[in-house]
């Protein structure tokens, strides 16, 4: 009797997943920088210019992941705007959370010869190598994997010289009994935040913004 009941429950869950599956791209909202607990907002006496990140993933600029439902239905997960906008905004938020004055900088090709940092002590730009979340939804078993890789360049505005180049890597995995857009966004937010925090924890970079 219990075995038959389990079969009915699983079949019902599978049918529910299929019936609720939305075809086509789905907007994933709420992906953002998460300020670590205990972060102290300082009073940095520098102005940091943030140039728009370049999306080097080789994917559509608004797509940041995929959801697969019971191996039958797939949805692209998309962001409002572009992934480059998302990362650029995340870096700005990370700096502001630490009391750093942030200024929008023009597009930068990441070479020392083209540094334009008027009114900025530091200029930051970078490339998005990876930013992706995969969600596989099975009845009572949802696996989420998020990965972020960024290459970041930091330049001294006065000297017109790149003083730091870092590759930031982060991965995050979780398993849940039910799918939720909130948990998916949280997983990718955590991976993005972890990557950006590596820059903020870098000793040489910290010296420049203190």
State where each predicted segment sits.
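Sec-dependent bacterial lipoprotein signal peptides
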Residues: 1-20
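Generic short beta-strand segments
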Residues: 52-56, 127-133, 169-170
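Short secondary-structure boundary motifs at beta->alpha junctions and helix caps
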Residues: 68-82, 155-201
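Sec-exported extracytoplasmic/periplasmic mature domains
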Residues: 92-100, 196-205
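Surface-exposed patches in mature extracellular/periplasmic domains of secreted proteins
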Residues: 99-108, 138, 208-209
């Amino acid at each position: 009797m219990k075995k038959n009941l389990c079969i009915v429950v699983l079949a019902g869950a599978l049918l529910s997943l299929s019936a609720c599956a939305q075809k086509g791209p789905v907007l994933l909202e709420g992906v953002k920088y998460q300020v670590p607990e205990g972060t102290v907002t300082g009073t940095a006496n520098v102005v940091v210019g943030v140039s728009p990140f370049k999306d080097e993933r080789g994917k559509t600029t608004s797509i940041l992941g995929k959801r697969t439902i019971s191996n039958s239905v797939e949805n692209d997960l998309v962001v409002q705007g572009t992934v480059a906008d998302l990362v650029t905004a995340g870096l700005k938020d990370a700096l502001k959370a630490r009391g750093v004055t942030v200024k929008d900088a023009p597009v930068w090709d990441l070479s020392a010869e083209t540094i334009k940092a008027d009114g900025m002590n530091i200029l930051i730009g970078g490339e998005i190598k990876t930013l992706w979340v995969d969600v596989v939804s099975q009845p009572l078993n949802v696996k989420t994997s998020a990965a972020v890789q960024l290459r970041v360049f930091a330049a001294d505005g006065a000297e017109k010289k790149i003083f730091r180049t870092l590759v930031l890597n982060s991965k995050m995995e979780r398993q849940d009994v039910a799918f939720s857009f909130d948990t998916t966004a949280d997983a990718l937010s955590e991976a993005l935040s972890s990557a950006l925090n590596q820059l903020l924890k870098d000793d040489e970079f910290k010296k420049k913004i203190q």
